[in-house]
Swiss-Prot record:
Bilayer topology annotation: Multi-pass membrane protein
Membrane-spanning intervals of the chain: 58-78, 104-124, 139-159, 192-212
Organism expressing this protein natively: Arabidopsis lyrata subsp. lyrata (Lyre-leaved rock-cress)
Extracellular side: 79-103, 160-191
Protein name: Casparian strip membrane protein 6
Length: 217
């Protein structure tokens, strides 16, 4: 009888130990499931932010690429503008070129500087696409972008006054319009001015894009 009781006690202890192991195993599985669900939730909330950040960086690169064409194209169009006509009334050869007017020279220099900077900033913009956590380089680009925006805007504004006088003249100052004689010259400078103002708009969008990108870091 004592041996039977001893065997029953041992079996009961074994059953209790097995039940305790089962309980511990169930708790471990629940903990692992909870950790897995939490990690999956973290991934779900992180991926959309990463995609948006990359999209902002790609948009910034595209804007810079178009701004390169706008600034360099305007500088080349203005810098190669010249025209010669023969005045039938005075029988003399009249020549005009952009370097005759200081405001147009400033326009060319401003757009050339901005275009050169934008070309150099393209590799950095590509780097930002693959490294969305970069912050210092974004701050530097934002500061220089703002300076280039001011430079191109001032150049375009100064050239606008000259182009207006070329088309309309100024009767008060007794300045006749020259576009009646130099129509090709006026068409070129007007076209380059339009391209420069498009570059100004693109630079504004670049600054806004850079500011948004920084605010998300």
């Amino acid at each position: 009888m004592e041996e039977a009781k001893h065997i029953e006690a041992v079996e009961a202890k074994q059953i209790e130990a097995e039940e305790a192991q089962r309980i511990k195993a169930g708790e471990a599985k629940q903990i692992e499931a909870g950790e897995t669900s939490r990690s999956s939730r973290k991934v779900i909330t992180f991926e959309p932010k990463l995609v948006i950040n990359k999209g902002i960086s790609v948009l910034g690169f595209v804007l810079r690429l178009f701004a390169v064409f706008g600034t360099i194209g305007s500088a080349l169009a203005m810098g190669t503008t010249h025209e010669s006509v023969v005045s039938l009334s005075q029988l003399v050869l009249l020549k005009v070129k952009y370097s005759d007017l200081p405001t147009l020279m400033f326009f060319v220099v401003a757009n050339a500087i901005a275009g050169g900077y934008l070309v150099l900033s393209l590799p950095v913009s590509i780097f930002h696409i693959f490294s969305t956590k970069a912050k210092t380089s974004r701050i530097i680009l934002l500061v220089i972008d703002t300076v280039m925006l001011a430079l191109v805007s001032s150049g375009a504004s100064a050239a606008t006054a000259t182009v207006y006088l070329a088309h309309e003249g100024n009767t008060t100052a007794n300045w006749p319009p020259i576009c009646q004689q130099f129509d090709g010259f006026c068409e070129r400078i007007s076209g380059s001015l339009i391209g420069s103002f498009c570059a100004v708009i693109l630079l504004m969008l670049i600054v806004i894009n850079s500011a948004i990108s920084l605010s998300r870091h």
